[in-house]
Amino acid sequence: MEWSQIFHDITTKHDFKAMHDFLEKEYSTAIVYPDRENIYQAFDLTPFENIKVVILGQDPYHGPNQAHGLAFSVQPNAKFPPSLRNMYKELADDIGCVRQTPHLQDWAREGVLLLNTVLTVRQGEANSHRDIGWETFTDEIIKAVSDYKEHVVFILWGKPAQQKIKLIDTSKHCIIKSVHPSPLSAYRGFFGSKPYSKANTYLESVGKSPINWCESEA
């Protein structure tokens, strides 16, 4: 199974013309993130056959030079967003490595699908592209990973992500969940949750190689 087949199946099942027309107008008349060529970067960097872990985000960062198509990741020269900083703090506490760069392309290439449930946003307007059709698309992506793969780790931070559990066959996949790494909630159970080591422990238990969560050249 490849993304091209999954995309074909989804677009055959659902009509995304209204969303397509909306995005054409938005990209023509407003500043929208990420750049059009990066909307699907999560799928470009993580082929379907390589998926070991799925980390769900919500919508892209809405500031300049941030979003580039991977959930939680920002472009190399951008400031660290607070949630990502907390993710790295937990990573250091969990498995002892310190990451210096704010982009997560190496995770994507390791087999971590960094999937936002909404893939575009207007500059400065969080959630501005919610309910235009992206949720239907990404729900189908989650279901496809659940249906066609085995032994994938789904890391679900916060209530919106955890609402997607209903799309996942929990009998053949691993669910790791906690509150969101946002500063508003991180101290209520994200810190100390050890998602990275838990994911690797599970992957090794089913005969898969672990994720290299530490810094790598990618």
Curated annotation (Swiss-Prot):
Key words of the record: Cytoplasm, DNA damage, DNA repair, Hydrolase
Catalytic activity of the protein: Hydrolyzes single-stranded DNA or mismatched double-stranded DNA and polynucleotides, releasing free uracil
UniProt name for this protein: Uracil-DNA glycosylase
Catalytic residue positions: 59
Main function: Excises uracil residues from the DNA which can arise as a result of misincorporation of dUMP residues by DNA polymerase or due to deamination of cytosine.
GO CC field: cytoplasm
Organism annotation: Staphylococcus aureus (strain MRSA252)
The family this protein is said to belong to: Belongs to the uracil-DNA glycosylase (UDG) superfamily. UNG family.
Gene name of the record: ung
